Amino acid sequence: MMDKFSKMKPRKEKEEADETVFSGEHFSIIKYDDWSIIKGSDAVICIPILIETNQIIMRYEYIPTFKYVTGQDHHLTLVAGSIEKGEDPKTALFREIEEEAGLVIREDYEVEDMKPLFCTKGSTSKYYPFILPLNERDYHEVIAKGDGSKAEALSKAVKVDIKFLDSLNPSDIITEYMLLKVKEYLNLKL
């Protein structure tokens, strides 16, 4: 059975034109092979680890979709954002960290790639996850300006002491996943 999956290759060309059901600013919905598929941008997600201070950087974020369901204004999430046209994951990562966390990472900083993962079965988007162990020489701090949106203006980066990792209460599965990865990373390094 595994041989079947190891030989899978991405579609090289469209056999037929995809039917667009909806097209919006951030995503579209297409019909393909009897499925409704959400077509959107890939995104970077990360947790910076500030080594000297034993802290991680998270986001206390205003997320309208979560508020719609829970009524709660703010949620604990990750530094994250879409990979824009012309960007590779590392470029998008450094831009998002500056916009959302106010950290300017030195250009020659080497990031370790983790395996990109699909967001859901119904979406073409992939998350490119990163854990960034940073020494003070790897970055300098600036004021996080966000992307100009209302949600960004109502959100902020927060530094969390590593000793409180087990008491954090994330609202989404990808934040939970990344916190588990950070704990795994820290246990390997201790």
Regions of interest found by a model, annotated:
Residues R11-E52:
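Acidic, metal-coordinating catalytic segment for phosphate/diphosphate chemistry
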Residues S36-G40, K115, I162:
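Short amphipathic beta-strand/extended segments with alternating polar/hydrophobic composition
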Residues S28, D42, H74, V79, ...:
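Residues that flank catalytic or metal-binding motifs in active/ligand-binding sites
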Residues M2-D3, K7-M8, Q72-H75, K85, ...:
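Nudix hydrolase/Nudix homology domain
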Residues I38-G40, I47, E52-R95, A151:
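Conserved Nudix-box catalytic region and its N-terminal flanking loop in Nudix hydrolases
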Residues T77-K115, F130:
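The catalytic Nudix box helix
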Residues S6-V21, D108-M114:
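Short secondary-structure junctions
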Residues H26-D33, E52, F118-V142:
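Active-site-adjacent beta-strand/loop module that shapes the phosphate/pyrophosphate-binding cleft
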